């Protein structure tokens, strides 16, 4: 029986894919779920696994051909259909004849992963990992075919456009088949693997011979060269070296990290994405003291030199954009195309806030366990203003011509991470005090940088704040996060000479701490006067500086 290999749906809006490389040639034998061909879309590069075991009898789409979703890529025939091509396949089985008993067992194992698949085996499905997440990419399998697993034991790592997480096993048993290989993209509800419950897997010893058709395990030295090609870079590290996924290798290359010096924290010492990010952060810190020693009195220059060592190796090269960079590119372009954006900027005198923070920060840090930055003050002022101006905390539906006015303030915060820009959301931020906001902001920013965000923390925002002043910028023109109607930038707080008016109306020149607040808003919903009133409310709240009660002063 022949099986058609078709271009799968590799994303919500992906309609086609381009064949980049065939991993098998016509006449080659393939196993079920063995990587067959590499394809590229505008969102992801991935490998397409074989839908059946057999022989690749015909390649229909050549390399560099673009094929629509559902279009035919190749044909897989079973050994009988393949004729001469099938002959080499049986020869591999007799090659293992010194162990005459295990040799007959591999064929039953393949059906075992297929037979229970129909009724006895429990499918492991791609779960919903967020409000608007429709698919996930397999980063790394934590178990191999034949391994025993417990209920809720981590089985596979997956990545979405919002979060990386581990999928637990839904039942206890044995992993009998893997349906989605590493780097494969699977829609929500799609099958990742199958678990045979312990009672159904009477052939518990079968896992030992089973790996022979699948060239993964280390027991047979001759089978090892087969898995080496996917991990070509670590191949020189001998048999005991842990497997490194393409995603991790790419991340290491982007950050100029030598994987030989990275200690893996994954199962069996495997190097995970978090290990590479931690090594990159450690490398950055190690290089930071040099500029600090030369200009100890000026903390600001520490930040600019740090990115240079990590990115210097990119000069003169062409690199594939990371997943987050591709998502950012698409989302920002779509935002500008779908909304009518413009930006209004107000200057704010932050002198009182600067004084309050200086008086309270030591006691605040001791009491709350986090540093008191300026961001909680901005967030509190924004929340108060959103409650007064509900047309800013709203969204416009172009299709239904309706405006939704939200009854809660879900604040997003733009966070610069090693992977790229993320905008995690503090839900119901309007219910938090200044101290509560400080703790929540510190927590969500730290988890965004370490990759430990929950899926729902990257969606559902009604308004976003971006701290453009963290790198010294005075003002910017933020790009909206649809369906949000506005985003506020907070510029660097700098000292400037300003006209100061006393209670009697007398004017003088004084040194004041000021910053700029640029507000980007959707003109389909918000007029310039609305934006001005909203910014004026924030300005008055900050210049008044009445936060003593929040700070215990």
From Swiss-Prot:
Misc: Is the only lipoylated protein in strain H37Rv grown on a standard rich medium. However, in a DlaT-deficient strain, another protein, BkdC, becomes lipoylated.
InterPro entries, per the entry: 2-oxoA_DH_lipoyl-BS (IPR003016), 2-oxoacid_DH_actylTfrase (IPR001078), 2-oxoacid_DH_E2_comp (IPR050743), 2-oxoglutarate_DH_E2 (IPR014276), Biotin_lipoyl (IPR000089), CAT-like_dom_sf (IPR023213), E3-bd_dom_sf (IPR036625), PSBD (IPR004167)
Name by which UniProt lists this protein: Dihydrolipoyllysine-residue acetyltransferase component of pyruvate dehydrogenase complex
Cofactor notes: Binds 2 lipoyl cofactors covalently.
Composition skew (Pro residues), residue ranges: 101-110, 206-232
Disruption outcome: Cells lacking this gene show severely retarded growth in vitro, and display no PDH activity. They are also more sensitive to nitrosative stress caused by NaNO(2), and to macrophage-induced killing in vitro. They also show at least 20-fold reduction in survival in a mouse tuberculosis model, and are unable to cause disease in a guinea pig model of tuberculosis infection. Disruption of dlaT leads to high up-regulation of the expression of the bkdABC operon.
Limits of the Lipoyl-binding domain: 2-77, 121-196
Residues recorded with modification N6-lipoyllysine: 43, 162
Family: Belongs to the 2-oxoacid dehydrogenase family.
Function in brief: Component of the pyruvate dehydrogenase (PDH) complex, that catalyzes the overall conversion of pyruvate to acetyl-CoA and CO(2). Together with AhpC, AhpD and Lpd, constitutes an NADH-dependent peroxidase active against hydrogen and alkyl peroxides as well as serving as a peroxynitrite reductase, thus protecting the bacterium against reactive nitrogen intermediates and oxidative stress generated by the host immune system.
Keywords: Acetylation, Acyltransferase, Antioxidant, Lipoyl, Repeat, Transferase, Virulence
Species of origin: Mycobacterium tuberculosis (strain ATCC 25618 / H37Rv)
Record-listed N-acetylalanine modification sites: 2
Stated pH dependence: Optimum pH is 8.0 for PDH complex activity. Half-maximal activity is observed at pH 7.0 and pH 9.0. Activity is abolished at pH < 5.
Catalytic EC class: transferase
């Amino acid at each position: 029986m022949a099986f058609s290999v078709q271009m799968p749906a590799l994303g919500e809006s992906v309609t086609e894919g381009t064949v980049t490389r065939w991993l098998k040639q016509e006449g080659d034998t393939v196993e079920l779920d063995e990587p067959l061909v590499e394809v590229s879309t505008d969102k992801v590069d991935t490998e397409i696994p074989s839908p059946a075991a057999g022989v690749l009898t015909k390649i229909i789409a050549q390399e560099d051909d673009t094929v629509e979703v559902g279009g035919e890529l190749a044909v897989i025939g079973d050994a009988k259909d393949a004729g001469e091509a099938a002959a080499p396949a049986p020869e591999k089985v007799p090659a293992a004849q010194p162990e005459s008993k295990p040799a007959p067992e591999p064929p039953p194992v393949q059906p075992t992963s297929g037979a229970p698949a129909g009724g006895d085996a429990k499918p492991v499905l791609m779960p919903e990992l967020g409000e608007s997440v429709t698919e996930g990419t397999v980063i790394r399998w934590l178990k191999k075919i034949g391994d025993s697993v417990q209920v809720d034991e981590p089985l596979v790592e997956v990545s979405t456009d919002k979060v990386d997480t581990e999928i637990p096993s839904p039942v206890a048993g044995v992993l009998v088949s893997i349906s989605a290989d590493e780097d494969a993209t699977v829609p929500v509800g799609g099958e990742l693997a199958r678990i045979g419950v312990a009672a159904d897997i009477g052939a518990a010893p079968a896992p030992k011979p089973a790996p022979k058709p699948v060239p993964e395990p280390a027991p047979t030295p001759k089978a090892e060269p087969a898995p080496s090609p996917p991990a070509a870079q670590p191949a020189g590290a001998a048999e005991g070296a842990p497997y490194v996924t393409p995603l991790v290798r790419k991340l290491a290359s982007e950050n100029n990290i030598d994987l030989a010096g990275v200690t893996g924290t994954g199962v069996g010492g495997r190097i995970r994405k978090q290990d590479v990010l931690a090594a990159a952060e450690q490398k950055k810190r190690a290089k930071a003291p040099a500029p600090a020693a030369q200009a100890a009195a000026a903390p600001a220059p520490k930040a600019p030199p740090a990115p240079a060592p990590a990115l210097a190796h990119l000069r003169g090269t062409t690199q594939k954009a990371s997943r987050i960079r591709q998502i950012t590119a698409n989302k920002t372009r779509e935002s500008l195309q779908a909304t009518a954006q413009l930006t209004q900027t107000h200057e704010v005198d932050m002198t009182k806030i600067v004084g309050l923070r200086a008086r309270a920060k030591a006691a605040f840090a001791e009491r709350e366990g986090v540093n008191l930055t300026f961001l909680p003050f901005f967030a509190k002022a924004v929340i108060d203003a959103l409650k007064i101006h509900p047309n800013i905390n709203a969204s416009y539906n172009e299709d239904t011509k309706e405006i939704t006015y939200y009854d809660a303030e879900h604040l997003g915060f733009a966070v610069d991470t090693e992977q790229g820009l993320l905008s995690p959301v503090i839900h119901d931020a309007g219910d938090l005090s200044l101290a509560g906001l400080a703790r929540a902001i510190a927590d969500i920013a730290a988890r965004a940088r370490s990759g430990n965000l929950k899926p729902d923390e990257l969606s559902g925002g009604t308004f976003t704040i971006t701290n453009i002043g963290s790198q010294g910028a005075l003002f910017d023109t933020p790009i909206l996060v649809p369906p949000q109607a506005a985003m506020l930038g907070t510029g660097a707080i700098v000292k400037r000479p300003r006209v100061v008016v006393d209670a009697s109306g007398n004017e003088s020149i004084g040194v004041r701490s000021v910053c700029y607040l640029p507000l980007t808003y959707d003109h389909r919903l918000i007029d310039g006067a609305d934006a001005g009133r909203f910014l004026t409310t924030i300005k008055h709240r900050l210049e008044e500086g009445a936060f003593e009660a929040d700070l215990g002063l």
